[in-house]
A protein has these predicted regions:
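N-terminal low-complexity or simple alpha-helical regulatory segments
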Residues: 1-82
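Solvent-exposed amphipathic alpha-helical surface segments
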Residues: 21, 63, 111, 115, ...
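Generic solvent-exposed, charged/amphipathic alpha-helical segments
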Residues: 12-15, 53, 57, 101-105, ...
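DNA-contacting interfaces and partner/effector-binding or oligomerization modules
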Residues: 68-159
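Extended mid-to-C-terminal alpha-helical interaction segments
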Residues: 133-211
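Residue-level recognition of alpha-helical structural elements
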Residues: 3, 45, 89-93, 189, ...
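Short hinge/gating elements
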Residues: 37-43, 86-90, 160, 179
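Short, well-ordered alpha-helical segments
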Residues: 50, 94-102, 168, 172, ...
């Protein structure tokens, strides 16, 4: 969409204006579960991490249109979350890739807990020589540059973990949603109701029978 294209351009322009090649990485390191709003809350209520990732794979476009997650087993003991649509015919969106990888890493850390650690992160971008160590430090794992894809790899054992349900995070998510609605109050309140119903109907937690 044009809005997505505009946002991605802004992200790249901000990095250039600040002369900060790690803009997306640093921005991503400041994100948390609350960043993905209702999707994060729904992920934390799933029975396993696999189910939570399936939620992300299915609904992430509601939060970040144009981003698609592909979840797949990689070998016998590894899992891959691949980020697609981070580029178009004209350019690579380097900062968006940094932000997406970092955000998923942060969300997984919150869902899994202290045991979380990615095995490797792959980025299609070229390495930024003086900042290479920062990538490994922020992501907490080996980072491979000039890769064929933007992806994060981790032990498939994590897929069976039960997501940590943090009531404080859920309270924050709800409060943030309410505050956003207060600040950005739309003239047509039905838009909010329609949006919420679409989200609930999509997840299956709401049906015409129980509304």
């Amino acid at each position: 969409s044009s809005d997505l294209s505009h946002y991605l351009q802004l992200l790249e322009l901000a990095a250039a204006a600040c002369d900060e090649p790690c803009f997306g990485l640093k921005l991503g390191s400041q994100q948390s579960m609350s960043t993905v709003g209702l999707i994060g809350a729904y992920m934390s209520r799933q029975p396993t991490i696999l189910d939570a990732l399936n939620v992300a794979q299915k609904y992430i476009y509601l939060h970040a249109e144009g981003i698609v997650l592909n979840l797949a087993l990689y070998g016998q003991n590894s899992c891959e979350v691949r980020f697609v649509r981070l580029s178009d015919e004209k350019q690579e969106f380097v900062q968006k890739a940094q932000l997406a990888v970092c955000l998923v890493n942060k969300v997984m850390k919150e869902l899994v807990g202290p045991k979380w650690r990615a095995d490797k992160v792959c980025l299609r971008q070229s390495p930024v020589s003086e900042h290479t160590a920062l990538f490994a430090k922020v992501l907490g794992c080996e980072v491979e540059f000039n890769a064929d894809t933007d992806a994060i790899y981790f032990s498939s054992a994590f897929l069976t973990y039960k997501p940590k349900l943090n009531d404080a995070i859920l309270d924050t998510l709800i409060a943030d949603q309410l505050e956003m609605q207060r600040i950005n109050k739309l003239p047509d309140e039905m838009l909010h109701i329609e949006s919420a119903m679409k989200m609930l109907l999509a997840t299956g937690d709401c049906s015409k029978e129980n509304t």
